[in-house]
Amino acid sequence: MTLPHSLGGAGDPRPPQAMEVHRLEHRQEEEQKEERQHSLRMGSSVRRRTFRSSEEEHEFSAADYALAAALALTASSELSWEAQLRRQTSAVELEERGQKRVGFGNDWERTEIAFLQTHRLLRQRRDWKTLRRRTEEKVQEAKELRELCYGRGPWFWIPLRSHAVWEHTTVLLTCTVQASPPPQVTWYKNDTRIDPRLFRAGKYRITNNYGLLSLEIRRCAIEDSATYTVRVKNAHGQASSFAKVLVRTYLGKDAGFDSEIFKRSTFGPSVEFTSVLKPVFAREKEPFSLSCLFSEDVLDAESIQWFRDGSLLRSSRRRKILYTDRQASLKVSCTYKEDEGLYMVRVPSPFGPREQSTYVLVRDAEAENPGAPGSPLNVRCLDVNRDCLILTWAPPSDTRGNPITAYTIERCQGESGEWIACHEAPGGTCRCPIQGLVEGQSYRFRVRAISRVGSSVPSKASELVVMGDHDAARRKTEIPFDLGNKITISTDAFEDTVTIPSPPTNVHASEIREAYVVLAWEEPSPRDRAPLTYSLEKSVIGSGTWEAISSESPVRSPRFAVLDLEKKKSYVFRVRAMNQYGLSDPSEPSEPIALRGPPATLPPPAQVQAFRDTQTSVSLTWDPVKDPELLGYYIYSRKVGTSEWQTVNNKPIQGTRFTVPGLRTGKEYEFCVRSVSEAGVGESSAATEPIRVKQALATPSAPYGFALLNCGKNEMVIGWKPPKRRGGGKILGYFLDQHDSEELDWHAVNQQPIPTRVCKVSDLHEGHFYEFRARAANWAGVGELSAPSSLFECKEWTMPQPGPPYDVRASEVRATSLVLQWEPPLYMGAGPVTGYHVSFQEEGSEQWKPVTPGPISGTHLRVSDLQPGKSYVFQVQAMNSAGLGQPSMPTDPVLLEDKPGAHEIEVGVDEEGFIYLAFEAPEAPDSSEFQWSKDYKGPLDPQRVKIEDKVNKSKVILKEPGLEDLGTYSVIVTDADEDISASHTLTEEELEKLKKLSHEIRNPVIKLISGWNIDILERGEVRLWLEVEKLSPAAELHLIFNNKEIFSSPNRKINFDREKGLVEVIIQNLSEEDKGSYTAQLQDGKAKNQITLTLVDDDFDKLLRKADAKRRDWKRKQGPYFERPLQWKVTEDCQVQLTCKVTNTKKETRFQWFFQRAEMPDGQYDPETGTGLLCIEELSKKDKGIYRAMVSDDRGEDDTILDLTGDALDAIFTELGRIGALSATPLKIQGTEEGIRIFSKVKYYNVEYMKTTWFHKDKRLESGDRIRTGTTLDEIWLHILDPKDSDKGKYTLEIAAGKEVRQLSTDLSGQAFEDAMAEHQRLKTLAIIEKNRAKVVRGLPDVATIMEDKTLCLTCIVSGDPTPEISWLKNDQPVTFLDRYRMEVRGTEVTITIEKVNSEDSGRYGVFVKNKYGSETGQVTISVFKHGDEPKELKSM
């Protein structure tokens, strides 16, 4: 690509003389061109024009001819090189045209043209004077031009031209300068002078060939993008020209209109995947999702497409396709087996669609009954008619070891959601006819597999089907008319009208199975529009009788499945049609039909082969089974050494190739394949050869990172990095090519592969620049060719500093650390290497930072304290006495992370007692080797260690462990694409532990799991037991008691369980004779152990007492006994409940309560639950004492005692106080006649166990003249007498009950104080009124009975201030005190006297007292009886 060139600087214009000459030459060329064209036109004319020019009238002298010749020579010499080039080009074109013309006529035409041109030239009219004047002017101009050109300042005939180039290519800037004398040339980059000596050798090359100036920039990098200027200067002046160079990163292989830049500018950015779809292992009935990330936003998200097995997927109720934030995802809310398959996502891109794919495997859901088979799949409805259809499905791949005996079919009508079992199909077939359906209704079906264990979960429901006459469409015809309109007519309209239908035809069996036959026939023709039904008849061959086939509903479709046929018999069938007018004649009988035998499953495929694919997958291929009944294949796998086959896929595979994902790297697997048909799953194929899961072998990728390690006069030492992808095999060697920059061809350095990555290249030319490239080779072949290296100058190194270290590599990469290793430089410089300087560069940074503050002496370094998740680049520089040398080639970016599944070195002791270090790498290629080193200083010493290598595992055994073996052991796995390495530092402390363990293994001791233990059994037996590790059947036990071996006896039983490692001694009745030491001596082969138990002194006495107590307790429990003894509980209502529970009772069992040895009838007992309950409503000191519950029957008795004295009683009262304190209500304020009362209600209060304290404004209050405090059983109060303003404020009541303290507060101020005072004043006034009010205090009875003729005297006491007015009432009427009635008042005593009472005096009397504060009436009823009539009241006395 080129950019518009830039002319010289604005201050350097061309000389005016040169511009004038250039215009003159251009004008002359144009005139000559017009003359040639005119001559050609004249020469081709048929007519020959003859005329005489004005020049023919003149005669030319010799001087004139000489002057014309000079003019011609001058003009020709003054032509520019561009005009000459155009003239030569025109001549070549004319010559080529002439060569293309052939034939005699063409030659004559050329002759005629030449003749006419000459004739025209000779006959041209010229003005002699004008010609002479022009010639003189030409000669004068040429002389002046020569004088100007002889000595002049520089100017650019051809300026620099801007360039845009790809990265790593070469650009050549050229220009032509004219000057006399030759100028001095200087090149600049962004106004900085270019000195090739200051740059890498061969970077810049500057040349000057007779005015042609050039600057060559090799291996362009992004940093070379700049403005380049060339300045020329001599004695007459100076000039400059500049051009821009743009270096672009290579983005694609195409160029021009197919280039990446053109596409990006035209179509937008390219969309690439930044993540990889991984295999998904979903489970039936559960959700799963797939997602992938893109490098750019997808402008049209709807253009992202998802496919399953090549079929386009769309969003639905169960499946959602989403796109957000550069992430496309497919989410399935409920997974079915039908969702299994190869999923592919396709995203459009300007350079063609980008695709990724992965496989989704769906495992069976958890069975409702363990061991039940998996669910069927692919349920489909075929041959749908008015009232019947054929249902098919695929059998499940996993029956869980139980053969399928049948299939249950469930039906759902419309969208009701109600599933009803409708049919059952035998287990040997996956096809079943469904009849009895309703025309016009829609149905869905699902299937369950049944085995002897149970039923599977249901399959996915079939698609919704609508029952109808699908032949009706065939009988309809569309007739177009009137520009696009159509009319639909039925052929039934053209048939003859019939009444009774004709018989059906072509009765035949469309399907014959083991359990049924599907009959089909053609409808009668003509059939008329009346709806038809059919009746069927069957006949056994040879019987001569016809039998009607019954059906639950009328047959409306020309299909019918016959289910009740007998095997080994042949049948013929015939059909009758029936409509509303009648029944047709029978059809012709069908051909003889018999049920088939049981369907056979398909044979397994042959030639099942397994091939390596990736680190976690294996590719399978097999020969196809050529059978039309084939539905697909099921694949099964198992690890080598196991017997159970695991299902790989649950949806039949249609092809003959499959990649099994999700396998464990390094493990060996076997595979088999089974054919699937409607008859079921066939037999398994032969198992494949065991295959280890590894990456398939491929050719390696290209080497890279070439570096110059040493250089002589005619030789170089080149190093490079290994391929990033080694192809799963060992690199056998490298092929190196070299290229001299001054030559065109590449030359091979070696014919045989170089085993190392360092090569010495000889026979080079000093001062030349060379570049190199290489290929790696493994067992798969020669890999990719690397890109050319940078140009290296072949110039002998003489600098005093050392050369670059090489082969800098990172290993043992973890989340925060890694280990760097490198090789020392090949060029030492002026002296030996004294150390190394290691620096690093963080991701995204251009600054190199030192790893350590000073140099290190070794060729390895552990770098720690790095940031997880970041990438780092490292480089190393060697140093000697002269200083730091050249830096090494930087490492590739190293990402710090803990890789999942990464292995570490295992340290332990084997079965023979040897200490070992082992490392396992399942992902290592087969050709890998385990390279062990100690302290990173090379191979291990074979005198001290022994190395054992197995498949994917290496083991280092220490022969004689000692202090010499301490250090850091590291291991690296070769030939792996990724870093597989680890290290372990063996310390002295760890070595001592391992040596101790080694001694134990070589001198084994039976491992003691549990020493001697003592248990007391239910009946009081004593069990002595100990547990050791599992022993062999040959193990021996010797039990020593008091230095004497004992054996089993009736009182002392000895048990020895070798399988469990259990030794036990059961002593029936422990006594003094069993006191002493028990020693168990165990021996199992070489292993021994001895365990001793001592039972003496207090230990034995305690054991003896416990055994006796246990024995007595066992005897107690032979009859009714207390399972739960007496215990107390305080309820929220402050009741005390005593409870206990009895067990082992019967109907005759008696329960009694006692208090202080006296039986209590108030106690309760529930025989059903065995619960006893005694409630104490209000506990007081009188309830203090001993409570006892007793249960008894003929088997024995038991009792339980609760002592409610002392601490137990205090605990109950404390609990009552706690509950009472918690029950306290918020403080209330109440006005009284004496003052203001503040109180709280409680459920219980006890002065001894509850303390109350009142506070006013946080100051404790004490009872006094104005402040009184008190409590009752249910209330705590504070009474303020004669309240004042100083009594306002916050009042707090603190209740303490044991450790429980509760505070209640209220604020006696503001409205609360005003309300209380108002109530106080009101009550006080009422009290005064009540005190002074007139009232009858006492004296009058309710009833007074008296005999006639007696005197009645009634006296009462009245009060009131002032003295009240007194009057008597009889039957609410005032009493007139005359004759026999008399009233007497003596102070507060009022008396009424009635003399000689009679029956008229009977009635209701009242004394009415009244003063200014109120009044009151005292009532009395007087009853007068006659002589001899004693009232009832007196009789009852």
UniProtKB/Swiss-Prot annotation:
PROSITE patterns: FN3, IG_LIKE. It is found in: Cytoplasm, Myofibril, Sarcomere, M line. Residues 1-49 are annotated as: Disordered. InterPro entries: FN3_dom, FN3_sf, Ig-like_dom, Ig-like_dom_sf, Ig-like_fold, Ig_I-set, Ig_sub, Ig_sub2. One of its GO terms (molecular function) is protein homodimerization activity. GO terms for cellular component: M band. Residues 375-469, 503-598, 604-696, 702-797, 804-899 form the Fibronectin type-III domain. Keywords: Coiled coil, Cytoplasm, Immunoglobulin domain, Repeat. GO terms for biological process: sarcomere organization. Its main location: cytoplasm. Residues 20-38 have a biased composition (Basic and acidic residues). It holds the Pfam family I-set. Residues 120-149 form a coiled coil. It comes from the Eukaryota. Residues 154-246, 269-361, 1120-1205, 1334-1423 form the Ig-like C2-type domain. May link the intermediate filament cytoskeleton to the M-disk of the myofibrils in striated muscle. Homodimer. PANTHER family: NEURONAL IGCAM-RELATED (PTHR13817:SF166), TITIN (PTHR13817). This is Myomesin-3. It comes from Homo sapiens.
